[in-house]
Swiss-Prot record:
One of the GO BP terms on file: DNA topological change
Native species: Mycolicibacterium smegmatis (strain ATCC 700084 / mc(2)155)
Other known facts: Few gyrases are as efficient as E.coli at forming negative supercoils. Not all organisms have 2 type II topoisomerases; in organisms with a single type II topoisomerase this enzyme also has to decatenate newly replicated chromosomes.
Chief site of localization: cytoplasm
Protein name stated in the entry: DNA gyrase subunit B
Origin organism lineage: Bacteria, Bacillati, Actinomycetota, Actinomycetes, Mycobacteriales
UniProt key word Thylakoid: no
NCBIfam families in the record: gyrB (TIGR01059), PRK05644.1 (NF004189)
Co-factor remark: Binds two Mg(2+) per subunit. The magnesium ions form salt bridges with both the protein and the DNA. Can also accept other divalent metal cations, such as Mn(2+) or Ca(2+).
Amino acid sequence: MAAQKNNAPKEYGADSITILEGLEAVRKRPGMYIGSTGERGLHHLIWEVVDNAVDEAMAGFATRVDVKIHADGSVEVRDDGRGIPVEMHATGMPTIDVVMTQLHAGGKFDGETYAVSGGLHGVGVSVVNALSTRLEATVLRDGYEWFQYYDRSVPGKLKQGGETKETGTTIRFWADPEIFETTDYNFETVARRLQEMAFLNKGLTIELTDERVTAEEVVDDVVKDTAEAPKTADEKAAEATGPSKVKHRVFHYPGGLVDYVKHINRTKTPIQQSIIDFDGKGPGHEVEIAMQWNAGYSESVHTFANTINTHEGGTHEEGFRAALTSVVNRYAKDKKLLKDKDPNLTGDDIREGLAAVISVKVAEPQFEGQTKTKLGNTEVKSFVQKICNEQLQHWFEANPAEAKTVVNKAVSSAQARIAARKARELVRRKSATDIGGLPGKLADCRSTDPSKSELYVVEGDSAGGSAKSGRDSMFQAILPLRGKIINVEKARIDRVLKNTEVQSIITALGTGIHDEFDISKLRYHKIVLMADADVDGQHISTLLLTLLFRFMKPLVENGHIFLAQPPLYKLKWQRSEPEFAYSDRERDGLLEAGRAAGKKINVDDGIQRYKGLGEMDAKELWETTMDPSVRVLRQVTLDDAAAADELFSILMGEDVEARRSFITRNAKDVRFLDV
C-alpha cells in the first residue's frame, strides 16, 4: 500500500495507551533490551524511534520520516503522523510522559490503534529515553505545538507552544556515553536500514542527513527513485543555495518490493525479463512477495515480518519454499521438462540464482528470540503457502518461455548437485586416508575442546612453516594454503568442490556445507584468516570470506571468523628491543616517542616494511600476530545479509562495471594503498 494519509476518524488518545512495566532494569542491564552496549546496541536506539515512525506510515497516518544525525552526535527522527498524545493519562501524568518513562507503554496492545507494528518487541522509545542523557520531544497535534524534555529519563514540564495545523512527532536524543562503548553512529549502517524500510513501505519517503561532515569531506548527496517524492522546504532551500557540507540521502520507492528485487539484482544478470510480484490477505495476515532469477549461483532470499528483518527466516519463508518447490516440480513434469522417471528437483536446485523478498504483516506476531530474527507463527506457513501456490502456478502458466528458462536453470543446478555429491564423496574418501580423517598438511592442536581451539588458515607455505613453529600447539592449529583458492562467486558447486584448497578447508572445519552444514561438528570455535598485509593478501582473504559466506554462512553469523592483523613495520633501535607498528600512524608515533626518550633508530635497517608473512620468523609471528595476550584480531560480523550479499557480488562477480563504480565511489575512503 502506498504511503498516503489516512483521514479515518479512529481515535488515538490517552485511552489507547496501556502500561505493562516500568523502566527500573533498563540502565542496569541494557543488553537485555537492545542486545549489546556496543555499536549494534547504539544503532538499535535509532531503529526503535524509526520503527515507531514507520508504524504510523503502516497504519496510513504518515507519508515521510526524516532522520538527522546532528554535529553534536545526537539523533533526531521526525514524522508527519498523528503525534504522540499529550492529554492527561489515567495515571495522572501527561500521556507523552507515560510513553517515554514506562517500559512497554504504547498504543500497540489493543489491536485497533495499530493493526500491525514493528516497534514494540522488547523495548520502545522509553528504553531510548532510559539510555540517553537527554531526550527532547516535539509534538504537533490538537492544533498546537507541544514540547517536552527528559533529563536522564526524568521529565520536565510539558509546554504548549503556538498554534499549528500540522501533525507529527520529532524525537531527538543524546545516547549516554556512560552506557555505550561508542556513541559514533555509522552513516552507511543507518542508510542501509532506512533504505530497507523505504523498500518495505511502498511510497514512503525517508530522508537521512548527517551534519557531522568536516569541511574537507566531499558532499555525498545521493537521491534515487525519488521522482514522486514531495520536496520539503529544506530541500527547496538547498536547491536554491547549492550543496552544503552534509551527507544527504533520500529513499522513496514507488515500486516497493519490486524496486527492492531490482536493487538486489542490479549487479547480476536476470534470466527473466519480468519481476514476479503478488500479494494476498487473510484474517490478521498479509503477504507481499517479489522475486526474479538471475544467472548466478547464490540464493538471495530476504524475509520480513511487520518490517522486522527476520534474518533466521521462520514460518513465512517455510511456506514460500514449500510452495515454490511444489509448483516448479509440478510444472516441470506437466510440461515434460522433467521426465516421469527423473527425481524431483530439490528446493536448493530451484532457488539457485533466486533473488526474492518476502514481507508479511501479522496482527499477533510471535518472534523467537529477544532480537526478533525468526517468525514463529505456525498459521503463517499455511497462509503463505496457499497464496504462493495459487500465484506462482498462475505465473508459470501465463509465462511459458520464462518459466522454461527457470526450470532449465534448476535442472542444470540439479546436475551440478549430483556432480558435487560425487566430489564430496571423493573428498570424504580422500580425507579418510589421511591421519584421523584430516588434511595431511593440517598441523592440528592437542586440545580436543572446540571452544578452546583455534584454526589459523595461512597464506603460503613459508608463512605456514613459521606459524607452525611459532604457535602454541596446545590450542592453535595451522592450515597452510599452497595454491590459489577458487572464486566461488563465479563457479558452480561441482567445480568448487574439486578445488584442493577448498577440500582442505571443508575437511578441517568438519561442519560440511549448505544443506549438510552442522555447526555442532565445528572443530575450532575461532577460525583466523592470516594473509599478507598487501593487496594480494587482501585478495586471498576476500576469496576465503566469499567461500565462508556462500557455503558456511552460520560460521560468519555466529562470530567464528576472524582476520589476523600482522604488523606493517618493525622498528629496530640501537641498544633497545625492536618494536612493531600496525599502521603508518602507529609507526610515526613510536618513532616520535622513541626519539623523545633519547633512543636512536638503526641507520641501515632501522625501519623494516613487511611485504609478507614469510618475512617474519616464528618468534616474530608469535609475538605480533598469534600471542593472545598481544595480538589484534578483527571479528567478521554479519549485520546486514542483503548488503553483504551485494558486496560479494560486486567485488567477486562478473559485473566489471559495477566493480569499477564501487571502487571509484569508495576510493576517497582508502587510507593506505600498497602498490
